[in-house]
């Protein structure tokens, strides 16, 4: 009898631990629940270790994610190599089939909340191989310094210097890339860095080669308003909750947990920077269907001292949605994927609107049954569907 009760209690506790609310139209929910449970377990262990003072939360999660790392092994379709671009590690994928013309080039930036991730992760290695083979393109997948060891602007600067190196005529010639067909792409935090470096590279007089396209996959684009409708509506959905998103943002700037606490309350933007809120005012930038009866409330003013200590969240290099229209107007053809069940959905939607308002050619794919991270999760139907949409657009436009 005692064993039966113990077993019953154990089953209930396990079920409670793994349960997450999922919308009815999410495909293959048990695969998502399993993946989310593994991430949740790793996160809880990391939190426990941090509570005991054993290790920083993100350092522990990085250790757990090491199982994702795969070697730069060439296959029957693609030659894979590793090198440095201006002291930044990159992994390069070159199709093996003969080409009589110069190939297009894609510079890819991985996600991971500026704290996790690597070009060597299985999910990014797989995507880069598929991209190189499918598009007959040279793919450069870049790494960059990660928090908590490094904070903004290190991540931006690493990616910027790496891309700038790639855009030299002699480097493109070395890898057989057509200088008229170079694009940049990234997912999540990589989408953030994609938008940021694309804006800044336009203003660099020493960079003569222009990017043809940029592709942003569920990008994080602003850290001023942490209570947009998608953050309220999707706050507990996998694989990125609102609390984890805010932890990533705050770690990007500092290990000082005071910033995280202020961001959780949406009370971190001081009055002195309130003029920037016009660029992220979802009440004027979101289509009506995504507002769903939410009422806009200006974020409660925060501490000027906090903003002065950690100015990154008011810097356009960290938050590309803060760029002036005069900058956005000159951006290249843009592709943006947003997902309905993603806390970052509204960042992407607002950027679509702002780019369209300034005359940029934008293709926007909204995945009605999509969620954060779906582009690179192995073995899911939605992953293949999203990758095909993404690669089809690149094939047509790059």
Curated annotation (Swiss-Prot):
PROSITE patterns: LIPASE_GDXG_HIS (PS01173), LIPASE_GDXG_SER (PS01174). It is a single-pass type II membrane protein. The chain crosses the membrane at residues 6-26. Residues 1-5 are cytoplasmic. Glycans are attached at residues 77, 192, 281, 324. The active site is at residues 188, 342, 372. GO terms for molecular function: deacetylase activity; serine hydrolase activity; triacylglycerol lipase activity. One of its GO terms (cellular component) is endoplasmic reticulum membrane. Belongs to the 'GDXG' lipolytic enzyme family. This is Arylacetamide deacetylase. The gene is Aadac.
């Amino acid at each position: 009898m005692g064993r039966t009760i113990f077993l019953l209690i154990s089953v209930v506790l396990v079920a409670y631990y793994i349960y997450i609310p999922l919308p009815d139209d999410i495909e293959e929910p048990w695969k998502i629940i399993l993946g989310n449970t593994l991430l949740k377990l790793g996160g809880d262990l990391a939190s426990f270790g941090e509570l005991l003072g054993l290790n920083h939360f993100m350092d522990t999660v990085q250790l757990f994610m090491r199982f994702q790392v795969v070697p730069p092994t060439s296959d029957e379709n693609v030659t894979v190599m590793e090198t440095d671009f201006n002291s930044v590690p990159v992994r390069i994928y070159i199709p093996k089939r003969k080409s009589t013309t110069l190939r297009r080039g894609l510079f890819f930036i991985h996600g991971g909340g500026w704290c996790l991730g690597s070009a060597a992760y299985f999910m990014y290695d797989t995507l880069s191989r598929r991209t190189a083979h499918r598009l007959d393109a040279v793919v450069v997948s870049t790494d960059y310094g990660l928090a908590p060891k490094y904070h903004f602007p290190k991540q931006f600067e690493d990616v910027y210097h790496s891309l700038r190196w790639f855009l030299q005529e002699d480097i493109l010639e070395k890898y057989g890339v057509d200088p008229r067909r170079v694009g940049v792409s990234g997912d999540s935090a990589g989408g953030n860095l994609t938008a940021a470096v694309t804006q800044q590279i336009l203003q660099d007089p020493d960079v003569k080669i222009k990017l043809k396209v940029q592709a942003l996959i569920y990008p994080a684009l602003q850290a001023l308003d942490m209570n947009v409708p998608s953050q309220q509506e999707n706050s507990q959905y996998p694989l990125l909750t609102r609390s984890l998103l805010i932890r990533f943002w705050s770690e990007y700037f500092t290990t000082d947990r005071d910033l995280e606490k202020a961001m959780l309350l949406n009370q971190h933007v001081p009055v002195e920077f309130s003029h920037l809120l016009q660029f992220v005012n979802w009440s004027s930038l979101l289509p009506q269907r995504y507002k769903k009866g939410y009422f806009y409330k200006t974020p409660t003013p925060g501490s000027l001292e906090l903003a002065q200590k950690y100015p990154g969240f008011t810097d356009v290099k960290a938050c590309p949605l803060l760029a002036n229209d005069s900058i956005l107007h000159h951006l290249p053809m843009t592709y943006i994927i947003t997902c309905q069940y993603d806390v970052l959905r509204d960042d992407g939607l607002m950027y679509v609107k702002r780019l369209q308002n300034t005359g940029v050619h934008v293709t926007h794919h909204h995945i009605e049954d999509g969620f954060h991270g779906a582009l690179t999760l192995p073995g899911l139907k939605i992953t293949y569907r999203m990758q095909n949409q993404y690669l089809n657009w690149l094939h047509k436009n790059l």
